[in-house]
Design a protein with these regions (language model features):
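Beta-propeller domain segments
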Residues: 1-124, 133, 143-174
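Asp-box/BNR beta-propeller loop motif
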Residues: 52, 204-205
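Hydrophobic core residues within well-ordered beta-strands of beta-rich domains
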Residues: 72, 193-194
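Proline-enriched interdomain boundary motifs that mark the N-terminal boundary
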Residues: 173-182
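Short, solvent-exposed loop/linker segments at the N-terminal edge
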Residues: 182-193
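Acidic, Ser/Thr
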Residues: 196-204
Length: 205
């Protein structure tokens, strides 16, 4: 809310005087001033508001879920079930009122919970197994599915892995991952074979 005078939780930038090439004191978030010679509006600005969620390149003590590395937050939608009453399929009530936000550089999508006044409560990884490739936009479609636009790995040129991803919600248990093995695929009678389902996974028991 205070950019370019402040960043994150109202950490101020010093004012730079280009005429004298000198740095001056940082702006006061309670009473920021626009001292630019190009300013055609107010000099005394409203109090700056700290960022709703902010995090550094390193580990965040306040938001450890976001990880580390380069950062580029991408805002997404707040989910409301009433918007999808006639949708073929819609996300469950669990996501009601939650904000989905991403980070282009880190490739995650977070599900962020807020209280009735819009204050931050908690966040959790949305689809932890899904690593988006430079997500630049997230929206719900009228069909109730979530669409994620991935920029891809290459900047300012063609990316073969750029794509539009559709994420649909399917109720009920997840499909098991089945692995079947046979000790032999054929032979003379009497044919004996040993069958195994080792490695089969049912995520929901």
């Amino acid at each position: 809310f205070g950019w370019p005078y402040f960043i994150g939780e109202n950490r101020g930038y010093p004012y730079y005087d280009y005429a004298t090439n000198t740095l001056h004191e940082e702006n006061n978030p309670a009473k920021p001033l626009n001292k630019s010679v190009n300013n055609t509006g107010l000099t005394e600005l409203p109090p700056a508001q700290p960022a709703f969620i902010s995090y550094p390149y390193g580990v965040s003590d306040k938001f450890p879920e976001v990880g580390t590395g380069s950062r580029c937050a991408v805002g997404g939608p707040v989910y409301h079930q009433d918007d999808f009453k006639n949708a073929k399929r819609a996300f469950p009530a669990y996501y009601e009122g939650k904000w989905l936000a991403a980070d282009l550089s880190r490739g995650w999508i977070m599900s962020i919970s807020m209280d009735k006044n819009g204050n931050y409560k908690s966040m959790e990884r949305f689809l932890p197994s899904y690593q988006a490739i430079e997500p630049i936009d997230i929206k719900f479609g009228p069909d109730g599915d979530l669409y994620v636009l991935e920029y891809g790995s290459n900047w300012f040129r063609k990316s073969d892995n750029a794509k539009l991803v559709r994420i649909e919600y399917n109720s009920g248990n997840r499909t098991p991952v089945v692995k079947a093995k046979a000790s032999a695929s054929g032979g003379a009678l009497p044919f004996k074979v040993q069958l195994s389902s080792a490695g089969t996974i049912d995520y929901d028991g």
